[in-house]
């Protein structure tokens, strides 16, 4: 399972080839290896508890727009910077306003220079994130000098340098916005016409590179490649948007066929979250697995023409199809697979909506029905996708463009198993879309791409999938694995089970020093969140219903409260956060949601796994701390 990975640890000449993909058992990276191009995270997060925030006296003046307050905060930190407000600001269901701003130079975006401000319901600044460029801005205006290469050369450089299977021999470019934005015509191999935008990119040596940001959607890799605009001979970094009626289904809470039997459910949608039901979009009603939140179909050849692919149809809206885990050919139960995938994705959509991932926060819906955000971005749900095996992927572009989920067949058992039948895999993949839309704002899908944030992207998926599958008799002594059924391995596809036992799972913050790929870092992060969740369950109890009970917008139990705080933390944290910054954002989420009612439980959970008060990154080495701040508990 993977989401976009931001690449570019250093600018690499085009003759340097990527290293072979490092694969772990089960859900791993695939396609083009972008590891050499990963950009290091450089964000700062000023939380509500820091002295810098306490000294920040800004409050929203009477009648003042919260966007203006955010501008004042930015200008107090970077008085000489030029910037623009990204048009994706919103007020979350916890009352916190989120404003995202992007630095500019000579009117050109600095694509990885972000600033986000969080303002509470009383108009006070709760926290802010900052990755603005602090070096010297070039004196000359490149738009005046026109000191940049032809964008066609940048497209060809991206294809050659990364080994993108794109034919661009007869390509032409069409200007969209003067001299800074282009669409390419005449290419072959991409799902849509590639584009190029002139942007700056802040480099690790604190200088700016003028680049063409070339977007190429190659199905299993959906790339933004930053090609030097002066020479067209250097790739400075890469982002990949792909991350590794009645329905007969395994109902919500059953992770896979080993946990129970399929049931026939009638009209299982939440009418508040899905006002058009799951099989309508406000314009039409469908008699198939198509609706406002997602369109599910088979995709055996791994292609992109999903609308014309097979999906089950029922004039009576009875999506009831046979399934046996022992069937020798997964294609024999494709209708059951599509129905299960459609059910799981829609149920998760409705749950996330209840917890705050709605239209204005950037959720995935075709028709937002005037509720904010951008529409036309349902999730394309491909069952038994033929573009891979033993894996799953999710592509999450910015708000207003459809997400894509690829569910594969797993061949580590005889007969093979269908990943759509393991709810945890579907939830993990969908959570990539959640974290991508909330972190950095709905309009910026480049903020879960750093060394640590990429790992947390995997960890959030594992955590949410594990929280959903908790059973009524579970306690903090209950352990869970990830992907065990699909992989035909009781140990699952992670190095350790999710457990509160340090014997069964010894992972701490310092283990990040030895991590070689994002799923290993994700296991560490999810292990921390698992500790926090059980601390909150011990305090507030556990609601085993498929949806939370809310009081003034706050879940009344510990399981759903932990999920809500994790989601609210995503919206608060800076673009490409570190573990420490993401921890602080969750603590700030509790400040905003419960008036600091759970600081002790949250701190104890993180501190148990080494992310306590004095945890630090020193000279490239992560140092554990098991301390809880004095006076918190």
Curated annotation (Swiss-Prot):
Name what induces it: Expression is controlled by the prtT transcription factor.
GO annotation, cellular component aspect: extracellular region
Q: Carries keyword Isomerase?
A: no
Classification via PANTHER family: EXTRACELLULAR METALLOPROTEINASE MEP (PTHR33478:SF1)
Describe the task this protein carries out: Secreted metalloproteinase that allows assimilation of proteinaceous substrates.
| Keywords, in A-Z order | Glycoprotein, Hydrolase, Metal-binding, Metalloprotease, Protease, Secreted, Signal, Zinc, Zymogen
For this UniProt entry, the molecular function terms from Gene Ontology, in alphabetical order, are: metalloendopeptidase activity; zinc ion binding
> At which residues is glycosylation annotated?
326, 514
A Pfam family hit:
FTP
Species name for this entry? Aspergillus terreus (strain NIH 2624 / FGSC A1156)
KW Nuclease (keyword) present: no
Q: Which GO terms describe its biological process?
A: proteolysis
Tell me what gene encodes this.
mep
Question: What is the protein's name according to its record?
Answer: Extracellular metalloproteinase mep
Q: Which cofactor does it need?
A: Zn(2+)
Q: What is its EC number?
A: 3.4.24.-
- Provide the cofactor note recorded for this chain's UniProt entry: Binds 1 zinc ion per subunit.
The catalytic residues are: 429
* Record propeptide residues: 19-244
**Record's subcellular location:** Secreted
What PROSITE patterns does the annotation carry?
ZINC_PROTEASE
- Residues bound to Zn(2+) are 428, 432
Family of the protein in this entry: Belongs to the peptidase M36 family.
Task: Give the range the annotation lists for the signal sequence.
Answer: 1-18
């Amino acid at each position: 399972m993977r989401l976009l990975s931001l690449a570019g640890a250093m600018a690499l000449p085009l003759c340097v080839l990527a290293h072979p993909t490092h694969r772990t058992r089960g859900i791993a990276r695939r396609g083009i290896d972008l590891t050499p191009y990963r950009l290091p995270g450089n964000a700062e997060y000023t939380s509500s508890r820091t002295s810098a925030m306490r000294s920040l006296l800004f409050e929203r003046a009477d009648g003042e727009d919260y966007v203006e307050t955010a501008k004042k905060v930015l200008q107090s930190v970077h008085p000489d910077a030029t910037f623009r407000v990204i048009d994706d600001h919103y007020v979350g269901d916890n009352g916190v306003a989120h404003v995202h701003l992007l630095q500019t130079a000579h009117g050109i975006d600095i694509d990885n220079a972000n600033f986000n401000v969080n303002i509470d319901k009383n108009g006070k600044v709760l926290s802010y994130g900052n990755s603005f460029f602090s070096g010297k801005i070039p004196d000359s205006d490149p738009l005046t000098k026109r000191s940049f290469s032809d964008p066609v050369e940048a497209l060809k450089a991206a294809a050659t340098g990364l080994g993108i299977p794109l034919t661009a021999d007869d390509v032409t470019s069409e200007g969209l916005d003067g001299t800074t934005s282009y669409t390419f015509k005449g290419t072959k191999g991409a799902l849509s016409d590639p584009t190029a935008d002139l942007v700056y990119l802040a480099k690790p040596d604190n200088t700016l590179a003028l680049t063409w940001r070339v977007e190429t959607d190659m199905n299993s890799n959906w790339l933004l490649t930053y090609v030097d605009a002066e020479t067209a001979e250097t790739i400075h970094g890469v982002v990949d948007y792909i991350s590794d009626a009645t329905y007969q289904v395994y109902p919500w809470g059953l992770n896979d066929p080993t946990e129970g039997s399929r049931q026939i459910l009638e009209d299982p949608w939440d009418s508040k979250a899905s006002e058009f039901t799951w099989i309508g979009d406000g314009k039409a009603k469908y008699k198939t697995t198509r609706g406002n939140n997602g369109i599910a179909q088979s995709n055996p050849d791994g292609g992109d023409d999903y609308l014309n692919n097979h999906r089950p149809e029922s004039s009576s809206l009875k999506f009831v199809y046979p399934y046996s885990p022992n069937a020798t050919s997964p294609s024999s139960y494709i209708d059951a697979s599509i129905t299960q995938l459609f059910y799981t994705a829609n149920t998760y959509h409705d749950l996330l909506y209840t917890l705050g991932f709605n239209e204005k926060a950037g959720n995935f819906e075709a028709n937002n029905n005037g509720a904010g955000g951008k529409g036309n971005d349902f999730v394309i749900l491909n069952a038994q996708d033929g573009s891979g095996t033993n894996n799953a992927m999710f592509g999450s572009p910015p708000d207003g463009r459809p997400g894509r989920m690829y569910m594969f067949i797993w061949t580590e058992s005889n007969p093979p198993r269908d990943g759509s039948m393991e709810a945890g895999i579907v939830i993990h993949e969908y959570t990539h879309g959640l974290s991508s839309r909330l972190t950095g704002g709905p309009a910026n899908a480049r903020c879960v791409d750093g060394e640590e944030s990429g790992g947390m992207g995997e960890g959030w998926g594992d955590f949410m999938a594990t929280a959903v599958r908790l059973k009524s008799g579970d306690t903090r002594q209950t352990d869970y694995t990830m992907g065990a059924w699909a992989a035909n391995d009781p140990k699952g596809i992670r190095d350790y089970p999710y457990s509160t036992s340090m014997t069964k799972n010894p992972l701490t913050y310092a283990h990040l020093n030895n991590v070689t790929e994002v799923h290993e870092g994700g296991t560490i992060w999810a292990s921390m969140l698992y500790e926090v969740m059980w601390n909150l369950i011990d305090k507030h109890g556990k609601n085993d219903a498929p949806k939370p009970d809310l009081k003034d917008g706050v879940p009344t139990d510990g399981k759903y409260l932990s999920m809500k705080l994790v989601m609210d933390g995503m919206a608060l944290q800076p673009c490409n956060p570190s573990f420490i910054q993401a921890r602080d954002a969750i603590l700030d989420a509790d400040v905003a949601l419960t008036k600091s009612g759970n600081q002790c439980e949250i701190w104890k959970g993180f501190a148990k796994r080494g992310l306590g008060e004095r945890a630090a990154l020193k000279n490239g080495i992560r140092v554990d701390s098991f301390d809880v701040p004095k006076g918190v508990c």
